[in-house]
């Protein structure tokens, strides 16, 4: 989402909320899934546990309020190079309006930009 220059944080938050509501209405009207991506604040990387949480979305409150599902991706090697299993990834279900939350262990194949279930790669 691009904001007009000169807007304060409050005005940007309001514009973002309008954009998110409009996108949600469009998704419902067309029956098409909508994927919104976001970087989290750099303060997350500096925590003892840098795994993403729903509270980390801060100014993106409109996104987490209107989203049916919110996912977070955590790769230990991105925060502590040389530790853990290379390619190991946690896909964290932070919000699921119609189901449970938790995480799935995935493996990231960087040469193909592909994730697979770490426990059942044939699935």
Question: Residues of each region from the PLM?
Answer:
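Short, small-residue-biased leader/transition segments that mark boundaries at the very start
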Residues: 1-2
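Conserved D-loop beta-strand region of ABC ATPase nucleotide-binding domains
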Residues: 37
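C-terminal regions of RecA-like/P-loop NTPase motor modules
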Residues: 5-10, 14-31, 42-123
């Amino acid at each position: 989402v691009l904001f007009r220059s000169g807007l304060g944080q409050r005005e940007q938050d309001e514009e973002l909320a309008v954009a998110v509501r409009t996108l949600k209405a469009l998704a419902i009207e067309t029956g098409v899934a909508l994927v919104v991506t976001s970087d989290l604040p750099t303060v997350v990387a500096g925590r003892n546990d840098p795994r993403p949480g729903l509270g980390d979305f801060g100014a993106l409150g409109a996104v987490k309020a209107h989203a049916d599902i919110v996912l977070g991706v955590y790769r230990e090697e991105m925060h502590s190079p040389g530790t853990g299993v290379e390619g190991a990834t946690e896909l964290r279900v932070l919000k699921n309006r119609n189901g449970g939350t938790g995480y799935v262990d995935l493996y990231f194949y960087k040469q193909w930009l592909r994730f697979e279930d770490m426990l059942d790669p044939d699935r």
